[in-house]
Amino acid sequence: MAMWQGAMDNRGFQQGSFSSFRSSSSDEDLMDIPGTAMDFSMRDDVPPLDREIEEDKSYNGGGIGSSNRIMDFLEEPIPGVGTYDDFNTIDWVREKSRDRDRHREITNKSKESTWALIHSVSDAFSGWLLMLLIGLFSGSLAGLIDISAHWMTDLKEGICTGGFWFNHEHCCWNSENVTFEDTDKCPEWNSWSQLIINTDEGAFAYIVNYFMYVLWALLFAFLAVSLVKVFAPYACGSGIPEIKTILSGFIIRGYLGKWTLVIKTITLVLAVSSGLSLGKEGPLVHVACCCGNILCHRFNKYRKNEAKRREVLSAAAAAGVSVAFGAPIGGVLFSLEEVSYYFPLKTLWRSFFAALVAAFTLRSINPFGNSRLVLFYVEFHTPWHLFELVPFILLGIFGGLWGALFIRTNIAWCRKRKTTQLGKYPVIEVLIVTAITAILAFPNEYTRMSTSELISELFNDCGLLDSSKLCDYENRFNTSKGADLPDRPAGVGVYNAMWQLALALILKIVITIFTFGMKIPSGLFIPSMAVGAIAGRLLGVGMEQLAYYHHDWTIFNSWCSQGADCITPGLYAMVGAAACLGGVTRMTVSLVVIMFELTGGLEYIVPLMAAAMTSKWVADALGREGIYDAHIRLNGYPFLEAKEEFAHKTLAMDVMKPRRNDPLLTVLTQDSMTVEDVETIISETTYSGFPVVVSRESQRLVGFVLRRDLIISIENARKKQDGVVSTSIIYFTEHSPPMPPYTPPTLKLRNILDLSPFTVTDLTPMEIVVDIFRKLGLRQCLVTHNGRLLGIITKKDVLKHIAQMANQDPDSILFN
């Protein structure tokens, strides 16, 4: 990346013909930048057959080297050649080929000396060392974020006089004046009304606490949005749609940089502490990927190869989910199912190791003080019954309906934000939403507490020692019967909690729509789980009371006798949380594993699977896209979804450019164009690459050359090769013919020429073309007829065609 910057910052092209290089690669044009390129322009590219190498030792990567090397200034690699522009897509085939060549070279050298053998071993070990570092950094940052967010969330309600750095729970841990009924009240913890007016009783004290709660929330939100806007605009949002796009090969420079990491970490704490309806789990994936990208720069193997770096980012995403949920296996499956585009077996092992180290690091930090990796770890002891699958499936249906509703409304609101004046005032928008959230949340204790604490409360299986209102049942039993509590009639506290939870459900459903997508770090996992957990707890309590009062009904009498512990409302909350999260994200396997790891209950996998699958079916029936795919399409990222089938009967000739009545395809000839001719084409077009043909008359294809490589090579030749002028002939052939005396030196650029561009015929079905683009990660392919070049299909053309076939606006596939 540093080399790329150097090459870009020192362009100094002759005659001013390249002044528009940085901005000239248009997404709309023929060779659009968001595709993936078959560009074998690097010296480390796919080699010829071994026998050819033996015959000609001068092989140099782009083709067989010429014996006439006088004018071939590219015998030495040029910094910048073969690298990628911002908002460009990598060439997966070339990058993997370069890595194979590098590995082959190291293996061959390791047989020659001990030092080379040591280098080979260190190269093989470097991947595991990098995973270890990513796990350590991700776990440490997650622990720091958890501890800071917990303290700052409690700061809205009061402060610990025994040490301001203690949160509410830690402040009262060592207090000798804590009663069992009020474990959260101790003399060391003072609310703001106690500090300001010396009392915690009465209407005025309530108003003071209310005012301070709203004030702190606005302050935290203002700091978060201001830091994002001023220092790191890429630190906003969840980050998962962009991570998916980057892992598919797209380059967004700075998105995984140092500033983004620092600002995202700080503002994530502020955003979570503000009380907005958002979570830290999605942004933690972004934070972990930032750690992975930054650490990659310490290893040449990953710094110089974009495909290898994306393998590391896939593992980093697994580590991010591992520390977000305390679910290392779920993290690996999340990376495989949801975010990764290319996931070889080696990446699976390394993702597992990175997730393991990250979880171990977080467990060592113990941010919640409960020796668990998450705040809402619970264990259930009562088995579920077959009849309960019916309410579990109902929760799945609710989750699917909620997911589809949320995606449609949130995307509509985000589109309005992008297309109206609303998007120009992100600070005001954040402050308004924060003020509304805080004002509505404070009166209800279930919305006033942090969302993670709310989920923990909803998942909780009530015991004898629980003092929560959700556990305020009437005790009509003999406690000597055993540890398991029978179903009991609900008390006044439970009924009060029910209507408060119903109001909390409405608030969470509505306010999350407007919160996700604002210019602050905002995850969606926790708000979605909260919606489902509230709905599940309400249904669970209803089922529990139904079983208690009507245990003689046919549906209950076979398995639920009076005085037995039949229904676990906390389990319903967990199933509802899984259903709603699945409805929004469309995750299935990874979701079930994450929820299983959260609860430690192997026997509850079937209810979770039933709810997750039902929610996905219902949500898919109402809209095919999950929230992350919908945001990818909204932002116009060039992401070619591998899960969708292309079923239309169109041909390559229907999609390729140029079309009929369009200008002819811009091409370069292999041996008849001058430097000035090429410079003119580059300055007058915005294509990011050009086919090279034998001649304009024959249109026989020779290869493909990238615009960026051309510019850097010509610039370098003018600086380092004497006599290269505008009238110098550019050769892409293996041998340059003898030139008359006194003619300017020729410029040989064969080494930047991709000699094996991917081609299809004009009658190739588009379903095959789309499959090729997906599976090979192509950036473009050339279309031929009887060996003659006809046109070109880029990744952008494929995406536009898919949108057009789906009756969508093809111009929406424009990255902005």
Curated annotation (Swiss-Prot):
The family annotation for this protein states: Belongs to the chloride channel (TC 2.A.49) family. ClC-5/CLCN5 subfamily.
Please report the stretch or stretches of sequence annotated as the CBS domain.
656-720, 752-812
Name the residues annotated as site: Mediates proton transfer from the outer aqueous phase to the interior of the protein: 281
Residue ranges, Cytoplasmic side = 1-124, 623-816
MF annotations from Gene Ontology = antiporter activity; ATP binding; identical protein binding; voltage-gated chloride channel activity
Q: How does it assemble?
A: Interacts with NEDD4 and NEDD4L.
- Free-text description of this protein's post-translational modifications in UniProt: Ubiquitinated by NEDD4L in the presence of albumin; which promotes endocytosis and proteasomal degradation.
Q: Spell out the protein name for this chain.
A: H(+)/Cl(-) exchange transporter 5
The residues that cross the membrane are: 125-162, 208-231, 256-275, 281-300, 348-366, 389-414, 422-442, 498-518, 523-542, 605-622
What is the residue range of the motif Selectivity filter part_3? 523-527
Protein location: Golgi apparatus membrane; Endosome membrane; Cell membrane
Task: Report the residue ranges where the short sequence motif Selectivity filter part_1 is annotated in this entry.
Answer: 237-241
Lineage, broadest ranks: Eukaryota, Metazoa, Chordata, Craniata, Vertebrata
